[in-house]
């Protein structure tokens, strides 16, 4: 199956599409034939084709792209024996071909030409992460011709892979502080135009990897509209320059097959950036550092009495979430209590399998078995073959056990469950009273969490919060000498923001399926048993009534927009009225006006992009909607300029609040 065919299959994820494109490049841009699941593609190629051993040369950006989806063993199966950074001192390997996968910069081109001059490798296969500008292409051609060694350059390709994929349908352009840049009064028009062009370039890469030219819908009046226009122009030029009769990229005129790209500004839903989620993946991202599938957990922190949220830990422990991590795939989207219950079940299953092995082999511990043993007993040989898989399973379970233990420690020390609880009912008097009680808990290691919850209450309360309540909260933070510049921006945003998110109508995702939240009897005392004593002290009283913390599943603003655009027949009138005003661009219309008043039509596939920062809460809510039984299953890919932690986004709007204050003072 060719890579283009793989990319067109509905059941293939965005991550799979990127992997297939990378593997095609590693096999010197030859079409790959593979009929199995794409996760086994390297094994199949390794067995079916004669491997050409190669060197892979990367830069910082391309390293991030590859390391998010492939491991060293995968590279080895693709014939990569050595991989190095382009700026490192590299030993000459004159008998070995080299694949370059680097950003299209003048500096990288100069290094490649120097490698060519010195005959560092036998052949040069040059691949750029995104489109090489014409002036740099001409520069490369001129420099190569001067060397007289152009015969060594076998390929020059634009790969359109300049984006990071960390989950099956989640991607990031790795552009930090985009919201700050786009909303800071000090930012020049030239800087905004340049940033929007960079974002459009990143989306262009993603669209070409998906291998289908989508309809573009975008919110008007902000950066999303600018980016949509720029991207529409780039895609239209691409369509014009491509022979549609011979390129699968342009196949599929049916809207159900083509899909839709929905570009939104972050202001559509500010609260989701600060919400305390009860979903396992969201909690790991929020509480610890989850970056490119690596979880970084602080091992030591200062005593209670200081806010550790920004302090550097004395030591950290890192855990890799492998792309084939079975527990993460099955549980990352579940509420924390359910995931905790499942890790215990996984451990018990492993223990049963290990006990069966020891019974069959007669050893007391499976670690006593030698995988290289030549024991003639057929039964033992069969058991030994299972050892690597079983060992890997145990390592995965241990990883998540350790993560759960660390999460529990943070839950207890910061009373994080209380913030999740108050955010469920932002408008009630009881919630406000409860929040004031939380402020009096005597803890100062959770000041950031308190500020986040207040922002959520302020933005999501439909009638607004009483002035005396707001004043009490502000006084609390001032008494604790905590920076509340962020609130200045939040107040301004609430005052001036369009009511687009307020006019969107939520939809329940409860559908009677197994995916719906169920009441759980699992308390923290039960979860504590899973950690095998790694936590000190009793924590059973922390969330004894766990089922009250499992709210009804419902859509959030971004999902309401996607629902209205992808499934208009089943969407509310309120949501349809909001999205009807969105920009509509069809890049395939190359003559006349390419923008027109949109007609309501259904789509099975979408790419949803948020300008100014995204989060795992929106990703999970969209996936839950896509796979709910409210409609036929949909494919929804979600991305942003950057997947941003609450702490990082709080810092951005704090700087905006301070900047606006200084401008007002001036």
From Swiss-Prot:
Region (4 X approximate repeats): 106-514
Keyword terms of this UniProt record: Cytoplasm, Membrane, Protein transport, Repeat, Transport
InterPro entries, per database record: Sec-1-like_dom1 (IPR043154), Sec-1-like_dom3a (IPR043127), Sec1-like (IPR001619), Sec1-like_dom2 (IPR027482), Sec1-like_sf (IPR036045)
Membrane topology label: Peripheral membrane protein
Superkingdom field: Eukaryota
GO cellular-component term (any): membrane
Single GO MF annotation: syntaxin binding
Ranges occupied by Sequence repeats: 106-142, 220-257, 436-474, 478-514
Subcellular localization, as worded in the UniProt entry: Cytoplasm; Membrane
Gene Ontology BP annotations: endoplasmic reticulum to Golgi vesicle-mediated transport; intracellular protein transport; positive regulation of SNARE complex assembly; regulation of Ras protein signal transduction; retrograde vesicle-mediated transport, Golgi to endoplasmic reticulum; vesicle fusion with Golgi apparatus
Function according to Swiss-Prot or TrEMBL: Able to suppress the functional loss of YPT1. SLY1 is essential for cell viability. May interact indirectly, or directly with YPT1.
More about this protein: Present with 5780 molecules/cell in log phase SD medium.
Similarity annotation: Belongs to the STXBP/unc-18/SEC1 family.
Subunit structure: Interacts with SED5.
Name of the featured protein: Protein SLY1
């Amino acid at each position: 199956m060719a890579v283009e065919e793989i990319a067109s299959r509905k059941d293939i994820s965005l991550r799979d599409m990127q992997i297939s494109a990378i593997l095609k490049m590693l096999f010197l841009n030859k079409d790959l034939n593979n009929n199995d699941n794409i996760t086994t593609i390297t094994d199949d190629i390794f067995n079916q084709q004669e491997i050409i051993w190669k060197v892979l040369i990367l830069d910082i950006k391309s390293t991030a792209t590859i390391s998010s989806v492939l491991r060293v063993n995968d590279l080895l199966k693709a014939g990569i024996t050595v991989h190095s950074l382009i700026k490192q001192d590299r030993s000459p390997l004159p008998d070995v071909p080299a694949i370059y996968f680097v950003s299209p910069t003048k500096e990288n081109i100069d290094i490649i030409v120097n490698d060519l001059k010195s005959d560092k490798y036998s052949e040069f296969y040059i691949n750029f992460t995104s489109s090489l500008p014409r002036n740099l292409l001409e520069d490369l051609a001129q420099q190569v011709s001067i060397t007289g060694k152009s015969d060594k350059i076998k390929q020059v390709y634009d790969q359109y892979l300049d984006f990071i994929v960390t989950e099956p349908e989640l991607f990031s352009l790795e552009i930090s502080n985009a919201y700050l840049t786009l909303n800071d009064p000090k930012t020049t028009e030239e800087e905004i135009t340049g940033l929007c062009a960079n974002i459009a370039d990143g989306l262009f890469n993603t669209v070409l990897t998906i291998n289908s030219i989508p309809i573009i819908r975008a919110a008007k009046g902000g950066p999303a509209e600018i980016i949509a226009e720029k991207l529409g122009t780039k895609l239209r030029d691409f369509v014009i320059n491509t022979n549609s009769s011979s390129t699968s990229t342009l196949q599929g005129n049916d809207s159900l097959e083509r899909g839709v790209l929905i570009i939104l500004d972050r202001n559509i839903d500010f609260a989701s950036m600060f919400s305390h989620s009860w979903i396992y993946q969201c909690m790991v991202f929020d509480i610890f550092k989850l970056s490119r599938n690596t979880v970084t957990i602080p091992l030591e922190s200062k005593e209670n009495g200081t806010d550790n949220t920004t302090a550097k830990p004395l030591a950290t422990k890192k855990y890799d979430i492998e792309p084939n991590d079975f527990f993460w795939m099955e549980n990352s989207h579940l509420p924390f209590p359910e995931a905790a219950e499942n890790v215990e079940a996984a451990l018990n299953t492993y223990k049963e399998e290990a006990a069966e092995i020891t019974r069959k082999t007669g050893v007391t511990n499976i670690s006593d078995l030698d995988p290289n043993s030549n024991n003639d007993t057929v039964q033992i040989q069969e058991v030994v073959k299972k050892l690597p898989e079983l060992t890997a399973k145990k390592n995965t379970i241990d990883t998540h056990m350790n993560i759960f233990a660390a999460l529990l420690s943070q839950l207890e020390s910061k009373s994080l469950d209380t913030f999740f609880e108050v955010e469920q009912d932002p408008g009630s008097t009881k919630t406000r009273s409860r929040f004031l009680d939380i402020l009096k808990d005597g803890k100062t290691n959770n000041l950031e969490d308190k500020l986040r919850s207040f922002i959520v209450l302020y933005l999501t309360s439909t009638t607004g919060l009483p002035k005396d309540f707001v004043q009490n909260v502000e006084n609390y933070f001032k008494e604790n000498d905590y920076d509340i510049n962020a609130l200045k921006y939040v107040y301004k945003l609430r005052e001036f923001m369009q009511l687009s998110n307020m006019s969107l109508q939520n939809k329940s995702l409860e559908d009677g399926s197994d995916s719906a939240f169920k009441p759980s009897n699992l308390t923290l005392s039960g979860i504590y048993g899973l950690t095998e004593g790694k936590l000190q002290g009793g924590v059973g009283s922390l969330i004894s009534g766990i089922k009250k913390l499992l709210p009804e599943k419902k859509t959030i603003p971004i999902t309401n927009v996607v629902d209205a655009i992808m499934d208009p027949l089943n969407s509310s009138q309120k949501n349809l009225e909001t999205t009807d005003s969105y920009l509509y661009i069809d890049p395939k219309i190359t003559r006349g006006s390419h923008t027109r008043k949109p007609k309501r039509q259904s789509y099975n596939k979408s790419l949803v992009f948020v300008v100014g920062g995204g989060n795992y809460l929106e990703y999970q809510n969209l996936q839950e909607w896509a796979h709910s039984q409210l409609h036929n299953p949909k494919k929804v890919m979600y991305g942003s300029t950057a997947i941003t932690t609450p702490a990082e986004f709080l810092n951005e709007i704090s700087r905006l609040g301070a900047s606006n204050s200084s401008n007002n003072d001036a």
